[in-house]
Regions:
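N-terminal pre-triad scaffold of radical SAM enzymes
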Residues: 23-28, 296-323, 356
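Conserved SAM/AdoMet-binding glycine-rich loop
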Residues: 22-25, 38, 52-53, 57-58, ...
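N-terminal [4Fe-4S]-dependent radical SAM core
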Residues: 1-17, 27, 236-308
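Glycine-rich beta-alpha loop elements in corrinoid/cobalamin-binding modules
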Residues: 35, 54-128, 140-258, 265-266, ...
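Short, low-complexity, charge-dense intrinsically disordered segments
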Residues: 576-590
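Conserved, mostly hydrophobic/aromatic
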Residues: 178, 315, 340, 454, ...
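Terminal amphipathic helices with adjacent charged low-complexity linkers/tails
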Residues: 59, 202-234, 239-247, 260, ...
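Flexible glycine/acidic-rich beta-alpha junction loops that bind and position SAM and/or redox cofactors
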Residues: 82-91, 154-156, 186-191, 215-216, ...
Length: 590
């Protein structure tokens, strides 16, 4: 079933009021790939009455107030993408299109949507007469506002904002909200809802951020907001501590002073067990837009997520420009084959399914089914990364589980083709001496749509080091194997290379060498080139703001002039006579 979004739907369900109202910057797509839908269905399955208001009109309180007041809390998310990333290009031009808005026109998601929606809710709540049967109001309090989603998660502590070109406070202060749940948050939101329902103090919930007058005992102190605004060295120190305390096994709680109050971040929620993941993806998602919003126009995102299957969560690639580490986590956890097969079978029964599974994968497709046992028991290593600069010998890289999974899914009745579109880490394939070639052969022969996406992002060693990406040697060896397997299979398939221009440390001379390398070694004229966007809470953004390598302290070149950023991209793409399409961060392979 769909979560209700109108009073008429609530009435048809026999509900007198809602426990939770979710507010989202995306249109309401009932899909396991949409965070608001997942959180809503998890709460609904636990017995809570949940409604959703998608992309509310912010010019008045009529839209936000159509479902009344919730008994327990408001849940606010900017949507699947940070609203500033959704609304502006890397060159700070307004985007015309939005894949998550009906009709595709980018007119419904406000800038800094988390803050705007929180303000809108408060305006509505203040307009409601005091007498109410709602449990929070019985205690003399309005229902709390709880922030979530990627925008809130990545802005939960003091952070650099590219669009203001300044350090901003935690979004919890700017939104004047009550709580913030970071990460994937299914377990955290259930714990929070239970506390609010039962009248218990929620401040111990893992994965929760809140504002306090005094710092909690035993938590690590981050340099204050005022300090990091004034001192880039302090900001670097702050980010190191923040980044290192995202692992559920080893993380400490954190606090950061803002003025005369404190932002408190509890340790992260434990990663989901396989049984929990299986249960989440077994919920009854409709995999389409709610009819109320569908009447306003189709959403382009459904073309990608409508019939895709998530096999796992998390990524230990830790690319410095990627936000997955501090949102979804660096520990990979995966669903059981039985759960994935059951979902694939359900897809075949969907009236709109044509036999094609658009993607079977995760943040990185070929991380399914294996993880470091030391990390699982003791937490992440603080002195080194899992697969950079080399794959750690403790990482038991094994593609066999995914090989077997792909075979089983593609053999299901009603399935014509299963694509692996998430993107691959070719260094993992090269590292797997036992099953790496077998896996690549499987993908080449059965799971490519004509082009395989890989993301070297650059080819110059000095830039790759700052990105945290493997060197060009691994790329060339992977290309050689891919081409050999294509010849053996009698197929004409190609590699598509994603590249980044104007990353910290990258010069125009570096991009000229990228162009020459692509022509000489890759035999292509690159099309998929994007200008680096400094998004909150990544190491690359830290480099952009401080103009330093945070790991060595050495100064680095950072291109900040918008025209020269565009020039870096054009050096590689100008032979095409156009500048190419901007690609969404969420679709880039790791």
């Amino acid at each position: 079933m769909f979560l209700p979004t109108t009073p008429e739907e609530v009435k048809r369900l026999g509900w007198d009021a809602l426990d939770v109202i979710l507010v989202s910057g995306d249109s309401y797509i009932d899909s396991p790939f949409i965070g608001a839908a997942v959180i809503g269905k998890v709460l609904l399955h636990a017995g809570y009455r949940v409604g959703i208001i998608a992309q509310p009109d912010v010019s008045s309180t009529a839209d936000i107030g159509r479902l009344g007041l919730p008994r327990l809390f408001w849940g606010v998310t900017a949507g699947s993408v940070d609203s500033m990333v959704a609304n502006y290009t890397a060159l700070k031009k307004k985007r015309r299109l939005d894949d998550y808005t009906p009709g595709g026109e980018n007119t419904r998601r406000p800038d800094r949507a988390t803050i705007v929606y929180s303000n809108l809710i408060r305006r509505f709540v203040n307009s409601v007469p005091s007498p109410s049967a709602l449990s929070q109001r019985e205690r003399g309090l309005p229902p709390p506002i709880v922030l979530g989603g990627i925008e809130a998660s990545l802005r939960r502590v003091a952070h650099y904002d590219y669009w203001d070109d300044a350090i901003r406070r935690s979004v919890l202060f700017d939104a004047k909200a009550d709580y913030l749940l970071y990460g994937m948050a299914e377990r955290s939101v259930l714990d929070l809802a239970a506390c609010l329902r039962d009248g218990r103090d929620p401040l111990g919930v893992r994965g929760l951020c809140y504002i306090a007058k005094e710092p909690p005992a035993g938590y690590l102190e981050l340099p204050s907001y005022e300090t990091v605004v004034a001192d880039k060295d302090a900001f670097i120190q702050m980010f190191h501590t923040f980044y290192r305390n995202n692992d559920p096994v080893s993380a400490r709680g954190l606090y950061q002073k803002h003025g005369d109050r404190y932002l408190v971040q509890n340790p992260p929620a434990p990663t989901e067990t396989q049984a929990e993941l299986d249960a989440i993806y077994a919920l009854d998602f409709e995999r389409r837009q709610h009819p109320f919003y569908e009447k306003q126009g189709k959403v382009k995102a459904l073309e990608t997520i409508g019939f895709s299957i998530a096999t796992h969560r998390g990524c230990y690639g830790e690319c410095n420009f990627c936000a997955i580490s501090v949102h979804e986590g660096t520990t990979v956890r995966w669903r059981s084959p039985e759960s994935i097969l059951a979902e694939a079978e359900q897809l075949t029964k969907h009236p709109d399914f044509k036999g094609y599974i658009s993607d079977l994968g995760g943040p990185t497709a070929n991380m399914y089914g294996f993880e470091c046992p030391k990390k699982l028991s003791k937490g992440i290593c603080t002195a080194k990364r899992c697969i950079y600069p080399q794959v750690c010998p403790l990482m038991p890289v094994d593609h066999q589980p995914q090989i077997e999974l792909l075979k089983k899914v593609r053999r299901l009745p009603g399935v014509k083709k299963v694509f692996v579109a998430s993107g691959l880490r070719y260094d993992l394939i090269l590292c797997d001496q036992t099953h790496g070639n077998e896996y690549l052969r499987e993908v080449v022969e059965h799971h490519v749509s004509g082009q395989m996406k890989v993301a070297p992002e650059h080819v110059e060693d000095n830039v790759l080091r700052l990105m945290g990406k493997p060197g060009r040697g691994a790329l060339l060896e992977f290309k050689r194997r891919f081409e050999r397997l294509n010849r053996q299979s009698g197929k004409q398939q190609f590699l598509t290379y994603y590249l980044i221009a104007a990353h910290p440390g990258c010069t125009e001379a570096d991009m000229q060498r990228v162009k020459e390398f692509a022509s000489r070694e890759l035999k292509i004229h690159p099309q998929q080139v994007q200008v680096f966007t400094p998004t909150p809470s990544t190491y690359s953004t830290l480099m952009y703001y401080t103009e330093r390598d945070p790991f060595t302290g050495q100064p680095i070149f950072v291109e900040k002039d918008l025209r020269r950023k565009a020039r870096q991209k054009e050096i590689v793409t100008d032979h095409q006579g156009h500048k190419g399409a901007q690609r969404k961060t969420s679709k880039r392979p790791s």
